[in-house]
């Protein structure tokens, strides 16, 4: 029968794929995979979110940096001084250099208008 052989081959193939994936996970976690970005045997350190971006030494100055690597603070002070809320500055790779935090305003209490009486000459008869 050919079916047990096929399922055994499929199981072996699946096992090899899972082993390969596990090996790659361990290499990524250990930082062993070389991306070929430099001629040295060292892997460039991964860029973590929230850290300032600096160009690696093998790139010329200004190459490889996003245009918003240094968030513009010139818009931060006037904006934060003219609004009801406040802003949290952040290093963002998406162009938004600060997050607005607006206060939660309670609704105004409804005031009841005093009952008006109509004049007798206007009231319906």
Curated annotation (Swiss-Prot):
Family matches, as PANTHER family: SOSS COMPLEX SUBUNIT C (PTHR31526:SF2)
Q: What is this protein called?
A: SOSS complex subunit C homolog
Composition-biased stretches, type Polar residues, lie in 67-77
Question: InterPro entries annotated for this entry?
Answer: SOSSC (IPR031821)
Q: Where is this region: Disordered?
A: 43-77
- Cystines in this chain: none
Q: Which GO terms describe its cellular component?
A: nucleoplasm; SOSS complex
Similarity comment: Belongs to the SOSS-C family.
Its BP terms in the Gene Ontology are: DNA repair
Pfam families per record: SOSSC
Per the UniProt record, the source organism is: Drosophila persimilis (Fruit fly)
